Amino acid sequence: FTYKLTRNFGLTADGTIATRFPRINEYAGTGPTEEQYKRVTIPLLRGGLFYQNDWINLTSMITYISKSNNIDQQNVTKPGTTQSKTTLLIYDIKTLGWTTSAEINLFKGFHLHALFTYQKPTYNNYFIKSPFEGVPDLNANGNIVKEIPQVLAEIDPSYNITPDLRLWLSFRYFGKTYANLTNALYFNGRWETFGGINWKVNKHLSLGATVVNFLNQKGASGTINGAELLGKEEAGKFKDHYMSGNYLRPFTLEFSASLSF
């Protein structure tokens, strides 16, 4: 749905709903149960405003999306030990978010894409009955989904020196992300940066050079293994300890060439 209030300004909205039954790999290790036969439903609703003129295309929208009956086999570890067990989980997730994006062309050859998102992805019906004596059950209802930041931003300027020679930069910000289900451990926000040049030499040859992480950001991301049941009151015990996880891509130079016939 799109409705123009003026020549440049208007309203937009749309909605979709997708459904499917669980995939065969989601039965792995447990065999089918009555709960696992339930249909997965993914509704999406969004609406907002847009403004367009000769040099800018601006859109701001509110979005709601959810997914029911996620099937997961969560490996949980008893805090402070190496004991672990696999638990079958069937849960829901939902998020309400606000996104504003802009496509800007200030002068010939220059283009800027910018995007900002604030969202709150949360778990619903997420309950783990602790398989370990002395370790409390986990109720993650209302907790922020791990590995998903609440704040996202993108800034992507580019400039075509000639129709065949293009310079570009990309700045991507990921806000604070939680590293476990209880939201006891988290990673601070970070920037990921890229830049490069692309040259179409002729119809057969294209050359490129890319710089990854040119701001030389350092840090970790993802999850922390073995921390699924760790409570907030216990999180301090892990300060200054080495733990496994993912790391940001280091400063890297990449060169490419492609041939087409």
Question: What is the predicted function of each stretch?
Answer:
Residues 15-21, 28-30, 53, 64-68, ...:
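Transmembrane beta-strands of outer-membrane beta-barrel pores
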Residues 1, 43-47, 96-100, 151-155, ...:
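Hydrophobic, lipid-facing positions within transmembrane beta-strands of outer-membrane proteins
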Residues 64-66, 88-180, 256-258:
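Gram-negative outer-membrane beta-barrel transporters
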Residues 21-22, 123, 146-200, 215-216, ...:
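C-terminal beta-barrel architecture of Gram-negative outer-membrane proteins
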Residues 4-14, 18, 39-96, 105-112, ...:
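Membrane-embedded beta-barrel scaffold of Gram-negative outer-membrane proteins
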Residues 176-177, 199-261:
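C-terminal beta-signal and adjacent terminal beta-strands/loops
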Residues 23-32, 70-79, 83, 119, ...:
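Outer-membrane beta-barrel translocator domains and adjoining extracellular loop/strand segments
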Residues 11-13, 47, 58-60, 112-114, ...:
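Transmembrane beta-strands of outer-membrane beta-barrel proteins
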